Amino acid sequence: MADLASESLIVGCGYLGRSLAERLLEHGQRVHGTVRQRSDAEALRCLGVNPVMLEVTRPLSFPALAPALEAEELDVYYLVPPGRSGGVPTPRQVILGGIAHITRQLRQGAVRRGVLVSSTAVYGQASGGRVDADTLPQPGGERGRLLLEGEGLWREQDEGDPRWRVVRLAGLYGAGRIVGEKAVREGAPLVGDPEALLNLIHVQDAAD
């Protein structure tokens, strides 16, 4: 990791966020991480991260961002999961509402770089062909469409400025998160097409 700001803010400091925080701390950064549960806040504190209790769909919780926004220079990583269909808040509220709320807050700080973690779900192609950064997104479901729209909101912060970046990750796996682990432990068969390919990335590779 090169060319880092003096401080970082990880919005949505969960499974991937904790791995990222550990690497940033190793490089001498002061790291702020947002969580929703007090138990998660304590876990971050034990890592050396300044925990921020925040709900991206609730602007009333945003004053907690003040210490991070006071940094002389700040790198921001937006890692908030999109939520579940039929859940509360809805994926639309989490993805579009969350990004809109947070980006308004970031205008108050000296943000040097902003990275939004999106998903390969924006591509939607399921024919087994090769997909890369130059492939035209063709989301086939609501989640992919919302993520693509959210990417647009993020890039609007400074149009054409490469400091505002989008990273599209595949499914995460790693310690404590193995595809099909629950079924294997219970002795149940893995349901699905045995010839299908899994699109995955290890959490440590994603953090790097």
Model feature map: region roles:
Residues 13-14, 169:
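Glycine-rich Rossmann-fold phosphate-binding loop(s) that bind the pyrophosphate
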Residues 17-18:
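N-terminal Rossmann-fold NAD(P) dinucleotide-binding loop
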Residues 47-73:
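Conserved Rossmann-fold cofactor-binding substructure of NAD(P)-dependent oxidoreductases
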Residues 127-166:
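Catalytic helix-loop patch of NAD(P)-dependent Rossmann-fold dehydrogenases
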Residues 172, 178-182, 191-208:
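Substrate-positioning beta->alpha
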